Every structure is written in structure tokens, then in C-alpha cells.
Swiss-Prot record:
Belongs to the PqqC family. The keyword Iron does not apply. Keywords: Oxidoreductase, PQQ biosynthesis. InterPro entries: Haem_Oase-like_multi-hlx, PqqC, PqqC-like, Thiaminase-2/PQQC. This is Pyrroloquinoline-quinone synthase. It catalyses: 6-(2-amino-2-carboxyethyl)-7,8-dioxo-1,2,3,4,7,8-hexahydroquinoline-2,4-dicarboxylate + 3 O2 = pyrroloquinoline quinone + 2 H2O2 + 2 H2O + H(+). The gene is pqqC. It comes from Bradyrhizobium diazoefficiens (strain JCM 10833 / BCRC 13528 / IAM 13628 / NBRC 14792 / USDA 110). It comes from the Bacteria. Pathway: Cofactor biosynthesis; pyrroloquinoline quinone biosynthesis. Transmembrane segments: none annotated. Its EC number is 1.3.3.11.
Amino acid sequence: MNAASLTGITALSIGKDIKLNSAEELEAALRHIGATRYHSLHPFHKLLHGGKLNKGQVQAWALNRYYYQSTIPIKDAVVISRFRDRATRLEWRHRIEDHDGDVGSEGGIERWLKLTEGLGLDTAYVESTEGILPATRFAVEAYVHYCREKSPLEAIASSLTELFAPSIHEERIAGMLQHYDFVNPDIMSYFKRRLTQAPRDANFALEYVRTHARTPEERASVCNALIFKTNVLWVQLDALQHAYVEGHIPPGAFVPKEN
């Protein structure tokens, strides 16, 4: 199998004509999906990392992204609830701690709030999620629903966007520090921490799907789960682009005071 054989992938699935007959072919297909559909390719991210947004637009991104970040441990709790296997639950549990933290230790959600606070947003307003775009809420809730309703294999597979996360974190850290005078290293701590957390999580999930997707149909479902997740990430940026770059902010959503 080569990249040319994967050109028939749609916005929903890899299609019925693609047969993945081994774990190696599965991994190759997953990496192709990431290389062609990960949200690092979205025009909004190009603007964000290239210093082309104003402060209000960066605030809007951080505010909306908070809803996704703060929902991740809820999603992971749902994933854990799908498994009778104790070893899998133990492995997955640290993901909740990574984001929620623990008594006396900071987690990813607190680090994200450092970012929004550093950008000048009121923390109570951010945590209320009252100002996020409707599309943000719909996409994130759809992700939780997916992990609850689909198979445990698909629930794990939907996390495989983490295979491609380190590169976007590196690009974001470098680009935002270089281009925005209102960004400093302290408020970028979330991304620095994920440089080590994401590869660990991705490696487990990749090995899990390689081992447990044993038929072409199961391998297709794994690929389709990753396609779904790339759509979840992509559509959130579509909404930000439409609202804050093209100027179509929906009623009641956050309106930046700075530009």
C-alpha cells in the first residue's frame, strides 16, 4: 500500500475499497491521515503561528480552546469506563491527572488558564464557557459522545491525533514567542509540558490499535476514528476563522476589546 492508494479517503471514512491487511498498513494509513488532515494545516493556525493575528483574535482562540482542553479529562474518564481490563484503565488514568492535576500539583487545565489570564482574559469568564462559539461546544460534545457510543477500540483510536501533536506544539511555542509581544514563556507552559506527555500517550494508543485491530474492518474503523477526530479539531478552527478573521461573530459569543 502507498499514498496513492489512499486518495479515495473522504471526509467521513477511508472508504470500502481500501483494505488494510496488516498492522504496518494500518500505521501507514494513520500517518497519511495525520499528514493530510491534522489541524496544523488549517489556515487559522498558519495565521496564529505566523504572527498574523491581533491580540483579540488570539484571545478568542485561547478562550474557545479552553473548552476542548477542560473536556479532555471528561472524555478520558468515559474511555476508562469502557474497559473491564484493569491494565488499560491504569494506563489511561494518568491522562486525567495530566490535565486535572492532583492535590498540590498543577495540571494542564491550570496551565491553560495561565495562558488565558496572561492574554488578559478573566478566569471566571473563561471557566464559565459562556462566550465560546456554538460550533466549539458542538464539536467537543460530539467527541465525548463518540467515545461513549463507539467501540472501545475506536475510542482509543480517536486519541491518535497525539501522534502529530509535538510538531504543532513546537511550531506554536516558537511562532507565538517570536511574533507576539504579549506572549511570554511562562504562559506557554502548557505546550512545553505536552512535548513529553503527548508522545508517551500516542505510543501507547498506537501500539494498542496495532495489536487489537485484527481484521481489515477493524483497521478501517481505527482509521475512521482518526478521521473523525481530525474533523473535530478542524471544524473548531473553521468556526474561529469565520467568526474572528472574517468577522461573523455569532450573537452572545466573545467580542474582543483589543486588536
